[in-house]
Amino acid sequence: MQKATYCDGSAIYSGLPYQSANGLGYDASQQQYLQALHAESEYHRPACSLQSPGISAGLHTSNEMSEVCQQINGTQATVTDTSDNKQPPTAPSGPSSPSSLNQIPNIDSAAKNPVHVSPTPSTRKHIFPWMKESRQNTKQKSCSIISVESCAGDKSPPGSAASKRARTAYTSAQLVELEKEFHFNRYLCRPRRVEMANLLNLTERQIKIWFQNRRMKYKKDQKGLGMMPSPGAQSPHSPVSLSSGGGGGGGSAYLSSMHSLVNSVTYDSPSPASYNKPQSNTYSLPTSYPPLNNCPPPQKRYQGTGTATPEYDTHHIQGNNNYGTQVQGSPVYVSGGGGYSDSLVGMGASVFGLTHLPHPSQGNIDYNGAITMGNSHQQGACDSNPCTFTDLTPHYSQGRIQEAPKLTHL
């Protein structure tokens, strides 16, 4: 770093005027001019830097030359180029006077001897004030950054030493308010979180983290108790409740009974029986139904295939006793006939909602194809005439209805 390390040759050879090769010479009277220039510009490069290598080769180092200049003059002498006409003096390229050449070794020896030189104000000026300020500013900035990181422990990066957060200790009042809020709403919106933070003197981040931890604890507790319902579906552990009404049952009972009957029945006839459609006047139905108290209803006669007298078995009628309450009132599908026959064991009218249909529950059953209603069906003064039902279905096969298994998959 060459800052003001050279000094003028006239400062060294102040009492020895000499004539240079180009006609310019130094004299002792030039020191006043140099001092005036030194007062104007102190930090410019000196005129010694313009010397030729002939004289500068005799000097060892610039530091030693600066120390010699400080001993002789005490101040740094600098020469600037004022104009092109006034050229600064340069050292002679040719051989100079013998006296000046003889003093160069003496200068070298004098430069080697004073190694330890007390610092002068000129040497102290090498460290400028702005340099000290910059170093202090950098130290202050680094200290301020460290202090900010240490103070704001929550916002520090995870790798730094100040990243370890202190465990937040909530007071009992804060915990009560947080638990109360969690009881009503497990997820807080931001306006409510800001309100809670202002109310409890906490930060939004602390409240958000508390709610996250509380939700995880709630889920863990629910899983431990086995009470967490699967979303959008019913839990497989909870049983399916079948609502059975008193005597008939509900719609679910009807579905389960029908499902069990369909699965248990075996079909051996590939095609259903063919029915001969009677004429339109075969069915003589009354157009009006008078009330039962006034007059007896007319005799209703259903004529089907006429001479076909199907054979009945009491087997499938007694098999209904093995079914539950839901199955007793359900119609029995008999193979081969392609139709349903009402079971006579239980009254299942409420299962199907067919309360308007007559059920021969108290009638006498004739297994030759006719069901005759007895006198026990009378209400008030009304005498019920026997209704003859000629069945439309052909021969029923024996023992086709088996006991239906209980369903567990519904």
Curated annotation (Swiss-Prot):
Q: Which residues bind DNA?
A: 163-222
Q: Which family does it belong to?
A: Belongs to the Antp homeobox family.
Q: Cellular location of this protein?
A: Nucleus
Q: Motif Antp-type hexapeptide, which positions? A: 127-132
Which superkingdom is the protein from?
Eukaryota
Per the UniProt record, the source organism is: Danio rerio (Zebrafish)
Q: Which PANTHER family match?
A: HOMEOBOX PROTEIN HOX-A3, PROTEIN ZERKNUELLT 1-RELATED
Functional summary from the UniProt entry:
Sequence-specific transcription factor which is part of a developmental regulatory system that provides cells with specific positional identities on the anterior-posterior axis.
Q: Give the record's GO CC terms.
A: nucleus
Q: What are the alphabetically sorted keywords of the record?
A: Developmental protein, DNA-binding, Homeobox, Nucleus, Transcription, Transcription regulation
**Segments for region (Disordered):** 79-126, 222-249
Q: What's the short name of a Pfam family annotated to this entry?
A: Homeodomain
**GO annotations under biological process?**
anterior/posterior pattern specification; embryonic skeletal system morphogenesis; regulation of transcription by RNA polymerase II
Q: Per UniProt, what is one GO molecular function of this protein?
A: RNA polymerase II cis-regulatory region sequence-specific DNA binding
InterPro entries xrefs: DUF4074, HD, HD_metazoa, Homeobox_Antennapedia_CS, Homeobox_CS, Homeodomain-like_sf
> Which cysteines are cross-linked by disulfides?
none
This protein's name: Homeobox protein Hox-A3a
